[in-house]
Every structure is written in structure tokens, then in C-alpha cells.
Amino acid sequence: MGRTYIVEETVGQYLSSINLQGKPFVSGLLIGQCSSQKDYVILATRTPPKEEQNDKVKQPRAKLDNLDEEWATEHASQVSRMLPGGLVVLGIFIITTLELADDFQNALRRLIFSMEKSMSRKRLWDVTEDEVSERVTLHICSSTKKISCRTYDVQDPKSSARPADWKYQSRVSASWLSLDCTVHVNIHIPLSATSVSYTLEKNTKSGLTRWAKQIENGVYLINGQVKGNDCDLLEGQKKSRGNTQATAHSFDVRVLTQLLLNSDHRSTATVQICSGSVNLRGNVKCRAYIHSNRPKVKDAVQAVKRDILNTVADRCEILFEDLLLNEIPEKKNYELPQRVFVPLPGSTVMLCDYKFGDESAEEIRDHFSEMLDHEIQIEDLEIAEEVNTACMTSSVNSEASLTNTSEEQPEQPKKTIGVKIQQNIGVIAALAVAVLAAGISFHYFSD
């Protein structure tokens, strides 16, 4: 028996409303949440067409093998940034004509693996062993309305298609639980004499990888309490009378990161010449959502962890893209983009995007519409309340980096020898005393 997908009814209405308009196919993304028992699909969004594709609409015999894999993969990467913790790109859908119904499976398989590879490359976290790794492909025939739902294990390159159940249901995410967290980020990334020549982006990613371990190993307080991983998240919560669907639970989460290593871990300090540093500082707003069907604490904590890691990494990546796109000259201080939330109609879930200070609300609205193919209202935009907007500072000591050349490198062995002599000075002194004593004894017995 394959996996079961519980799908919001509005997703079915959206898919039914898509008109091919002479195109051989239309493809897009399915967004939702995985759980051990079943998966939930709460949103579908078609991939926006390329501008140059508008001139090729009149080609009815186009093959699905010509599906622009790179363009669809980039769309998935962009949309993944707009998902708070707990939500993922669950898979893809494709709507085709009857003539092309048998020509889609290979193209879908390649696309689903390409998307997963692209999105996983940017992650600061690793997939756990017990995590659901199946992703869905949904094929709809525009003529017969027949649905074919299959899954692939994206962690297994040799995975073959498995059938899955596709079931519509109303108000799937109307009572999902939200977890809110504000994290103060203070990441110091020293630049060694060798890494100072690397790009700001590469050095930042290296530092974020080390910081991610702190977040992964942190202690998470949910409403001020530490709960066991296998406990029910709603344990101890009062049940509301009447319609439980109308009540949305919200949890406050705080993160305690470990400053010192445990006593059973030995630490050795690495001393190196630094020619500068990169610093990330500020408060970032994090938010995660989890289904209300007996959710576990470990699933909620994992959703929060990943949102913390994703939002910081995404902000840095957006900054680097902006610097490259607009050819902004290097400077010491950069302001990271702020997070903006927007509600999903009929749901307690909010999606997100990022804006720089000089971007207008209209630009953010248009970006939401382009990426998610859903109209939103400007008044629904919620800019995250970040008291200190996260920023990045970069300082490079050019003199230090220039003086630390290969000409000075031969001195390092001398320093090492000197250190070794200091470390073994006691042994040397003892040896000298022993030699002196032996000499005196020899002289004594000679007399």
C-alpha cells in the first residue's frame, strides 16, 4: 500500500480551473506537510511560463521531454524560500492532453529528483533516517479528468514509481498549530589568511554551517517548558467546547544554545592568523506550522529548527543575489532583507517572502502572485516585527592579508621548534643535570 495524500478541496478547484490554452501541458508544485502516517497538500501553484515560451504556444505536438527542467527547478527553489517551518515542496503536478498521457512519466521522474537535489544543496540541515523521503507526482488528463498519483523515494536514485491515494478533504489546515520564535543571531566568522581571498558568500556559508550545529543541539522551550520528544504537543492543553476547527493554537518557542562543551569532550584551540571577519547580528522572526492530528513534540521542534536555519540562510542568499544582480560595490555593512508573512485563505498557515528596505509593498505583492499564482491584498502583508533588523558586517585587514605571504611562511617552522623547546624545557634541564652528575662521579672515581 502506497502513501495517502489528504488534499485541501481548494487545491482540487485550482487544478480544475487551469486551462491549457493550446499548450501541450502545464506543470507546477504541490506544497504541504509530511507526517509518518500520511501527507497533507494545502497549496498548488503552477510554474510561471518563460517569456520566450509565449511564441511557442501554437506547437500542439511538443513533447514532454522538452519540459524545461532548469526553469521548473528554479521555481521550486524560489518557492521553498517562501515556506515557513513544517512546509515543504511535496512534489509536482502536470496536466496534459490525452495524446500526451503516456509521455510524461520519465520527464516527471527526472524533474522530481532534480528539484530535490537543487533544494537540498542549499540546506544547513541533514535529513533524518526516519524522515519521509517520498515525493509525489500527480498527472491529470485534461480530457478525461483522470488522475494518476505516484511517488518516488528521492533518497534512492534507483527508486521506481509507487501508486498513492489522492483524497480531497475540506479545511485540511484550518486548525493547524503555529509555533513562533524570535532568535537573536550573533555569528562571528573569522577569516584566516587563506580564506580572506574567498568570496564573502563562501566565507559566510562556511560560518553558517558551524552555527547550524549550535541550533541543532539547542534546548527548545515550548511555552516555557522542556517536553519529551515523544510527548504529544497538545498534552496539557485545554480542549475548547463546540467546534474545535475554529480554535487555532499558538505556541511560544525559545531557544537555548549551548555555550560550553560537556566535560567529557576535550577541546583543542586552533590559533591562526586572521585577516578579517564577517559578522551576522540581529533578531530574526521564525515561524513553523504543524498539523493538529496528534502532533509530536519532536516534529514541532524539528519544524522550528529548520525554519531558523532556512530563514537565516535564505536571507544571506537573497543578499548575495541582490549584490550580484545590481552590481552593488563592496562595503562594510549590509542590511539583510526582512521577512514578510501573508495568510493562506481558509487556513491558519501563513506563507512568507523577504523584502529590502527600499522595496514597496506592491513589489512584494507582485512577487507573491508570480511565484504562487494566487492574488493577495497589500493590507494582508505582515512585516515581521524585528526590533533590530539583521545585518551583515565585513571587515578585512588588507595589510594583514598582504603581509601574510609565502615569504613569511618559512618562519612558521621556527616558531614551532621554539614552542617544542619550551614545552620540553623540563626534560632538557633534567638531562643536563644527569650529564653533569655523571661527569662529577667519573671525576670522583678517577681520583
From Swiss-Prot:
Q: According to its record, how does it sit in the membrane?
A: Multi-pass membrane protein
Tissue-specificity statement: Ubiquitously expressed.
Keyword Transmembrane set for record = yes
Q: Got a GO cellular component term for this one?
A: membrane
What compartments host this protein? Membrane
Q: Which residues cross the membrane?
A: 82-102, 425-445
Can you list the disulfide-bonded cysteine pairs? none
Highest taxon above the source species: Eukaryota
Q: What keywords appear on the UniProt entry?
A: Membrane, Transmembrane, Transmembrane helix
Q: Which InterPro entries match?
A: ODR-4-like
Can you tell me which family this protein belongs to?
Answer: Belongs to the ODR-4 family.
According to its UniProt entry, the function of this protein is described as: May play a role in the trafficking of a subset of G-protein coupled receptors.
Q: What is this protein called?
A: Protein odr-4 homolog
State the species of origin: Mus musculus
